[in-house]
């Protein structure tokens, strides 16, 4: 059962996030993402709890053991499990789920790790605001309760109108729809900004390869440079020889570890990755769905992180 106080608090928090977005400043954008992410998690959790009250507590309802496990995982602290549960219930699409998980990741890296994401932070925050507003418009509130002790903030009143103890579901749906409409007015540059940041990332790695190859940009030399970079970084570890044994290295054969890694070992990235990365960039640029574009961006950044760091070192 959802309390109207809970819904008005969500409205209040989203309006506060909107104030931050309008300022278009990286620090305010970071604060906005934290607020929006919290609204998303609270909204999902409240709806999951309302289902659990029925499906786990009433003995007359038959629920499979797999469904129980899934529901109990969603009741836990993990954000991803809550959002994935929403897909199984038809609350959101798989695309929206992937986008929310990706955006939650940006929230965590910005808040916990201090990563700035300055080139894309504003468009990410707007996209998250829009996504959460869309979710709340279609939010199946189910049964809800009001109380004479409810306190409706001035921020929430901007969307709900005259103070009342009998706000209907239609009031809240209209309020969240208004926020969704405002998110459209804020603009949508997510695909463009993601592509720009991804392009800069690729060009940085391309420059690193050119530096290692001493500006000899023949394919063979660039392939060698990628292998050399990984070999160099690996051998800086004081336990390199011990770890190399697991890779197939045998010191008794008389070959230096560095030479063996450079000449004989088959690295996971053994060729110049830049052409393939540029193909992925073109694929992102061609996307019409911001959520699919975000998934492609996040996948690229995660999958190429290790080799990019190696080339940078």
What annotation goes with each model-predicted range?
Residues 1-9:
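Acidic, low-complexity proline/glycine-rich segments
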Residues 5-6, 27, 89-146:
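Charge-enriched, short contiguous segments at helix-coil
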Residues 29-50, 129:
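Short, hydrophobic, well-ordered secondary-structure elements
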Residues 133-313:
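Polyanionic, low-complexity intrinsically disordered segments
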């Amino acid at each position: 059962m959802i309390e109207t106080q809970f819904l008005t608090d969500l409205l209040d928090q989203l309006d506060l996030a909107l104030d931050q977005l309008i300022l278009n400043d990286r620090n305010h954008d970071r604060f906005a993402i934290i607020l929006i992410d919290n609204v998303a998690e609270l909204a999902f959790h409240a709806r999951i709890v309302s289902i659990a009250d029925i499906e786990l507590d009433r003995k007359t309802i038959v629920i499979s053991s797999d469904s129980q496990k899934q529901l109990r995982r969603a009741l836990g602290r993990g954000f991803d499990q809550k959002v994935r549960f929403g897909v199984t219930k038809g609350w959101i699409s798989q695309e929206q789920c992937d986008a929310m998980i990706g955006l939650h990741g940006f929230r965590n890296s910005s808040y916990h790790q201090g990563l700035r994401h300055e080139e894309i932070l504003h468009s990410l925050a707007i996209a998250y605001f829009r996504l959460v507003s869309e979710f709340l418009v279609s939010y199946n509130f189910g049964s809800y309760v009001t109380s004479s002790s409810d306190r409706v903030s001035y921020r929430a009143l901007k969307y709900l109108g005259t103070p009342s103890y009998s706000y209907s579901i239609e009031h809240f749906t209209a309020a969240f729809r208004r926020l969704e409409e405002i998110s459209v007015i804020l603009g949508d540059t997510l695909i463009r900004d993601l592509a720009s940041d991804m392009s800069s990332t690729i060009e940085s790695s391309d420059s690193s390869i050119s530096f290692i190859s001493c500006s000899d940009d023949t394919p063979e030399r660039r392939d060698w440079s990628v292998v050399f970079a990984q070999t160099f970084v690996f051998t800086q570890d004081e336990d390199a020889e011990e770890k190399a044994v697991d890779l197939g290295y045998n010191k008794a054969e008389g070959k230096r570890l560095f030479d063996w890694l450079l000449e004989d070992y088959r690295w996971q990235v053994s060729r110049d990755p830049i052409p393939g990365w540029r193909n992925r960039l073109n694929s992102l640029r061609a996307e019409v769905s911001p959520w699919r574009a975000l998934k492609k961006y996040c996948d690229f950044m995660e999958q190429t992180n290790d080799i990019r760091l190696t080339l940078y070192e």
